[in-house]
Amino acid sequence: MKQRVYIQASASYSEIQEKRPFSNRDLDRISQMCIQTVERVSAAAQIQDRNVPLFVGTAYGCLASLYEFNHVYESEGALRVNPSLFPNAVLNAPACRTGISFQIQEPMYTISNGRSSGIDTLELAYLYIAHNEIREAMVCLVEEDSQIARKIAGHSVSEGCFAFHLQTEKGKVEIKETSYVFELQEIQRDSDQQAADTMAFCTLVHEFVSDWEPKDGSSRCLCLERKRIALERV
């Protein structure tokens, strides 16, 4: 029997908007943003035990760190490379660094498959909980704007980080699988957005969760699709 899955809390962080320097300069910027945002959503959800499965999604990953590492290697040779930069160049570094910071012993996943990484990561966490593989999950979606990321994307990349706490206990927003969309009535078409851009997707979901303060105990519904997401009150 499939479990119902709810988003209990969400949080966001942007170094550019908040103008707060990171305390640990040994970590890459994506790892720093993940740690800051998970800290915030843990406080918002009043999570005492942070040892929960972690799902990190990013379209481009730590491209700035990888580019810096490879640039020195190609231009000056392997002996000139700073070995301390290598951990930051690994794709799953943000998930591992966040796990170490919060002493997470549960599985940690990194999804990086292009512009749909945001919706794919949230959907993967949903499926794990819905099928009773895990009881709750922390989903962290992050992007870094860098020179190499701009070249790949063809434009500037929206930078920031969002975290969502998912579990089976009833919360503000319930996640529904794709097939359920066709059964919904009076879907708010004005709220439909393309889910291709990670930060645009995260911003919409974060606002959807944060703005919902019902007095009658009702919840909202988040329906995941490949092309868009549908939002409605249920």
Say what each PLM segment does.
Residues 122:
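Short-chain dehydrogenase/reductase
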